[in-house]
Amino acid sequence: MHAPEARLAQVIDRFDQVEARLGAAGDADEIVKLSKEHAELKPVAEKANALKSARAELAELAEMMEGDDAEMAEMAREEFYALKERLPELEHAMSLMLLPKDKDDSANAMIEIRAGTGGDEAAIFAGNLYGMYQRYAQLQGWSWELVSASEGEHGGYKEVVAAISGNGVFGRLKFESGVHRVQRVPATESQGRIHTSAATVAIMPQPEDIDIELDMGDVRVDTMRASGAGGQHVNKTDSAVRMTHIPTGLVVVCQEKSQHQNRARAQEILKAKLYDMQREAANAERAAERKGQIGSGDRSERIRTYNYPQGRVSDHRINLTLYKLDDIVAGDGLDEVVAALIAEDQAARLAALEDDA
């Protein structure tokens, strides 16, 4: 797909405008806003300039090939075909950069992991996933903060929520939402039989200017004692907070030691969940006419299987199978899966744009 000249000129012009305004800006908020846009536009403008120059050079070389000087024409011919061979790669890279952006891709995110079918083993697997994403976040240079956790009786988590902050968190992790399935022999299994368990992962964007008004009149707040693994009460005061959003039925529980902190945390998670619900509804509306989507986008869709006996991880949406289970679950090898999903999404969206063109 060829990037149109008008679109390239538009990108370069906008970058020049932002750069000029950044040099003259005095307001701190405006500087922050312009700096962010400048950082986003710079690689696109550089690629656009490189492509523009390559196209112009190709036209010049084509003229030189028609010239009277045979030696110069031959040199021009060699350069022309070498550049012509490189041009599709530049065009493709530029087309990817010009794809419409998901406005939430640059946002921070909350990750919620819930043990599904499989009892204790599902909770242990939820704990494995938590460790995998925490390590991945560390490798990406993101910050990770545990927000709330309900521990499993034999390790892992029944449910756990963490906040991840950094550059492009949601854009990289958004395809992790869905049902993750594990096949392995649990530590508690004496017969050596393979069990299948599952955990659900939800990645929820947290834009800085989250556009959600939470009417506390719609929220029922209950306080109770925080409980640890096995259900035992870990303190003697009613510090745990459960918030129920009555219109949607969404429930959030936070059970750290401070009730005040739990209230603030629960509100934050509730807002993220409501925003995510709004976003999912909008996506579902577009899904009917939209091509180029990775999987169904449904949170109940089984997206990936981790098969321990075979050392295999399979992502069912893109037919990807890797025999690198230990490396992936450790977090170190997860980026290969993430990058494959992003590349597949970009290819599908490019194909959809070409179909519409």
From Swiss-Prot:
Stretch list, region Disordered: 284-308
PROSITE patterns on file: RF_PROK_I
Matches recorded under InterPro entries: PCRF, Pep_chain_release_fac_I, Pep_chain_release_fac_I_sf, Prokaryotic/Mito_RF, RF-1
Modification after translation, per record: Methylated by PrmC. Methylation increases the termination efficiency of RF1.
Ranges of compositional bias, category Basic and acidic residues: 284-304
Molecular function GO terms recorded: translation release factor activity, codon specific
Location of this chain's protein in the cell: Cytoplasm
Pfam short name (any one): RF-1
Keywords assigned by UniProt, alphabetized: Cytoplasm, Methylation, Protein biosynthesis
A GO CC term attached to the entry: cytoplasm
PTM-bearing positions, type N5-methylglutamine: Q232
Annotated PANTHER family: LD18447P
Family designation: Belongs to the prokaryotic/mitochondrial release factor family.
Function: Peptide chain release factor 1 directs the termination of translation in response to the peptide chain termination codons UAG and UAA.
The protein, known as: Peptide chain release factor 1
Gene assigned in the entry: prfA
